[in-house]
Amino acid sequence: AIGKWHLGLSDRTGGQDWNGFITPGPSDIGFDYSYIMAATGDRVPCVWVENQRIVNLDPNDPIEVSYEKPFPGEPLGKDHPELLTKLKPSPNHGHDMAIVNGISRIGYMKGGKQALWEDENIADSITCKAVRFIENHKDEPFFLYVGTNDAHVPRWPHPRFVGKSGMGPRGDALLQFDWTVGEIMGALEKAGIAENTLIVLSSDNGPVVDDGYADRAVELLGEHRPWGPFRGGKYSIFEAGTRVPMIVSWPAQVKPGVSDALVSQIDLYASMASLMGKPLEEGAGPDSRDHLDAFLGKDLKGRDYVVEVAGSLSVSDGEWKYIAPSNGAAYAKLTNIELGNSKEEQLYNLKQD
């Protein structure tokens, strides 16, 4: 497991001891190696965790983290904007607490100065670790999870990408993501295993343009519509929040094409188990369904329906989508996204509405 994790570390939420072996973690759920972010790019602690220990941590400068109150003497973004030498937060998003690498974050931290990452090097770190893993395991079957951080805030790409997109840091970060994918593909080809490697590229949610930092992403978006023809975006129960890109590549088995088969990322678990001929243990992955043929382009239908529960309940069969009543907000002003919540039942024909 390499890159953005955001699945939690330790069983003490908000009370982790970051200065030793952090458990539970990736090794407790089957990963033999991990090099991951402790949380997300916009949250403290801003450090790499390799095999559940913080990288480059000086034992004489231990890390302390709090999401409740600041540490005396540690400057905050909201109080010291002059220290925000790279990015400033958008108003009212909450990214105005601890300052790391000239960017303020969510949460408070002190210590660990030697272990702190530099945002402009995050993509290089993830890519180098992924390529090295491929090189070291090219002669044996392997599973590699790579979670990129490029589109996630704060967007501060490496200088070699800055200004190349004409769309500011967000556009430059997407070019950086494209480079990462190319480097990983190149490593597979160099190792001679690209033809028989199954690659799944997808996103964990729909797009959000302004998600907490004043990077001019909205201003420089131009006519580009990252949400396509759909309503909503990240945080939304509408299609732009729940329908995400997915590219499956396996040259030895998958023919090029486009499929509208209805699947869920949750189905990858049962489907990959089926591919390996290993039935799931009783009680494992109860929501996961074996739709291997849909992922491989052999079944163009997929699921009969998919359910999402994320504040609101929705059920879709690919043609119709039902959204249950909810008391949640209908619109997120800070991110300019329709959330899809309504006190009334909603039913949409996805091909006509």
Residues covered by each model-derived region:
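C-terminal cap/loop subdomain of S1 sulfatases and analogous C-terminal strand-loop tails that border
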Residues: 13, 19-41, 56-57, 207-215, ...
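Catalytic-site neighborhoods of secreted/periplasmic enzymes
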Residues: 1-112, 324
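Anion-binding catalytic surfaces of enzymes that hydrolyze or transfer phosphate/sulfate esters
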Residues: 85-154
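Short glycine/proline-rich turn/loop motifs
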Residues: 104-115, 159-164, 249-253, 351-352
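Metal-dependent active-site segment of extracytoplasmic phospho-/sulfohydrolases and closely related
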Residues: 178-214
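Loop/turn elements at helix/coil->beta-strand transitions in domains of secreted/extracellular proteins
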Residues: 29-32, 137-144, 193-199, 243-244, ...
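The substrate-binding groove and active-site-proximal loops of carbohydrate-active enzymes
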Residues: 112-124, 163-176
